[in-house]
Amino acid sequence: KLLPILKDKWEEDCIIITIDDDTIYENDLIKNLVNDYYEHKCVVGYRGFTPKFDKLEHFDYEKRDNLQNLSLYNFLTGKGGVLYKPEFFHKTKDLIFNDKIYSDTCDKQDDIWFYIVRILNDIKCYTTLKEWHTKDISAIGLYSVFNSKNNNNTLSFTKTIQKLKELHYM
């Protein structure tokens, strides 16, 4: 859902907010995301965590640290709504659109792709324990069906980092 609108708005100074269609959100979600963006000037979302690692290459989706509200390394899951700006990805030019990388390394984990490219662009992420939804109406999600098995998010993350190193993005 992010990539088509991001490509369309690439040269614009605008805010893009992604949400899921299987969730009923708090009435103030958009207002809160925008207000937090103006305060912190970075990616903002309300469902995420601070991973526990000493180097990016040692990322493990299942290892969590105490939440730091503002950090380069905060990981957001799109379910909680995420606020982006196209300029957050400009430093690495059109890397974000390189489907030869992400379709090969993290085709079921777009959150991982956006996370890594955001970090390569040196854009921090703000997250907090703010109410963001009233009801989840999904019967089953991608995480429970695929990504929770065998630590697939971590495996995809590692593959993506390796590929980016091979291509000299890191």
What is the predicted role of each segment?
Residues 5, 9, 24-99:
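Conserved catalytic core of nucleotide-sugar-dependent glycosyltransferases
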Residues 11, 76, 107-109:
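A generic fold-level signal
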Residues 19-22:
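Active-site acidic Asp-centered loop
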Residues 1-4, 32, 39, 159-170:
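Electropositive, surface-exposed helix/loop patches at the edges of structured domains
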Residues 3, 10-12, 37-40, 70, ...:
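Catalytic phosphate/metal-binding cores of nucleic-acid and nucleotide-processing enzymes, i.e., regions
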Residues 16:
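Short aromatic/hydrophobic "clamp" motif used to bind/position activated sugar donors
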Residues 91, 95, 99-170:
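C-terminal catalytic/acceptor-binding lobe
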